Amino acid sequence: MATIWFLPLLFLSCLLLAALRLKKRRQHQRKPPSPPGFPIIGNLHQLGELPHQSLWSLSKKYGPVMLLKFGSIPTVVVSSSETAKQALKIHDLNCCSRPSLAGPRALSYNYLDIVFSPFNDYWKELRRMCVQELFSPKQVHLIQPIREEEVKKLMNSFSESAAQKTPVNLSEKLASLTVGVICKAAFGVSFQGTVLNSDNFDKLIHDAFLFLGSFSASDYFPNVGWIIDWLTGLQGQRERSVRGLDAFYEQMFDLHKQGNKEGVEDFVDLLLKLEKEETVLGYGKLTRNHIKAVLMNVLLGGIGTSAITMTWAMTELMRNPRVMKKVQSEIRNQIGGKSMICLDDIDQLHYLKMVINETWRLHPPAPLLVPREVMSEFEINGYTIPAKTRLYVNVWGIGRDPDTWKDPEEFLPERFVNSNIDAKGQNFELLPFGSGRRMCPAMYMGTTMVEFGLANLLYHFDWKLPEGMVVEDIDMEESPGLNASKKNELVLVPRKYLNL
């Protein structure tokens, strides 16, 4: 009889003890400061058109670790170099996965890519393969002839405009340059005079960027948001965009099968070879969809970030004539009278590298990086960050933090003189490519494109504002979206440097 009562009492005692321990644990947990929100939507109304700017303003009141509720999703934003270090280095393994987002899920064939895939064995093996085969320093040097060819075409175009003293849309030209390099390196096909140089291709790329950076209700209300996306037409637009990109990839595969491509071995060749070798990634063999997902990363990542950085750099240089004169003098003195800059010359252009670092500080291409998802609970500054929390790092705000940078709104490349700070992910004051396990694997490729492109622009030409325009007329507005590009295009007049 005693045994009958003993077992239920033991069970209830265990439940009570567990409840008390849970209550005590919760009492010791500290949530980060949080701005007040509304029922259902939480803090969504506070995001604004440019979330990185809105969140930076909020962090000035609520601190560098801030908890918000975006719909039903708990979200933490870190906005200082110290808190970024804690998240991306000290606790990197706790928060190096990715959240489930509708646009990335569709474009990546259900997370078969490098950027948006959750953290697992498949992602680790895919990243290792891509770093070794696609983004290694060896591969970056192998495609240097492609960069040189595309830059030469651009310089010839500017020479024609200079002879006629006509303005050029530099934003558009730099975007075409990066598209040309990426398409030749990835697909073995020139941009000009091919299927790529069409309104349809431009629309495919534009729509893909739009879906990656626009508001999707299902990202914030997972259970019912898909209904809103369906009613607004977003779901249908997304599906059409994915079908269009899929058809484009298939067209590129057909060109390779038929041998109708140009030049040396490209990214598609390398990936198709790995598919033929039945390369195993995590839970299965490399398939055509895996290749398409990786090509999406190469295409969208390569086209967006390099052109954005070069455009912002030229914008800042036009607003700062002293810096423009200094960087051009360095380049022209170092290069001498050569008709073309080579990759080895770039290593000697120290002030140019400072100009680029300063551009990344003020204008990181992805101002909030790509969001992370917390896998296991950890603490930042004594605040508990639970599992399943979405995590953003506001690198745009970190670059403007007066506790880190003197005169943070001033464009001053000299701040990097005798400084060990660089953009390689170990200095948390400057994180244009992120840090930790989810750092951009194509950092070296992107940096090389920016350095080589800018060096040629500044070596071959002097740049003037269109007639009737003064420095004060240059606007600095950013466009909304995942990438913070210049909202209004930069239009300048090239003038041939006569001493060449």
UniProtKB/Swiss-Prot annotation:
Leader sequence residues: none
Enzyme class name: oxidoreductase
GO cellular component annotations of the record: membrane
UniProt subcellular location: Membrane
Transmembrane segments: 2-22
Membrane topology: Single-pass membrane protein
Domain of life: Eukaryota
Gene3D superfamilies the record matches: Cytochrome P450
UniProt keywords, alphabetically: Heme, Iron, Membrane, Metal-binding, Monooxygenase, Oxidoreductase, Transmembrane, Transmembrane helix
Main location: membrane
InterPro entries: Cyt_P450 (IPR001128), Cyt_P450_CS (IPR017972), Cyt_P450_E_grp-I (IPR002401), Cyt_P450_sf (IPR036396)
EC code(s) of this entry: 1.14.-.-
A Pfam family the protein falls into: p450
Cofactor(s), by name: heme
Record flagged with keyword Iron: yes
The family this protein is said to belong to: Belongs to the cytochrome P450 family.
PANTHER family assigned to the protein according to its UniProt record, in alphabetical order: CYTOCHROME P450 71A9-LIKE ISOFORM X1, CYTOCHROME P450 FAMILY 71 PROTEIN
Protein name, as recorded: Cytochrome P450 71B37
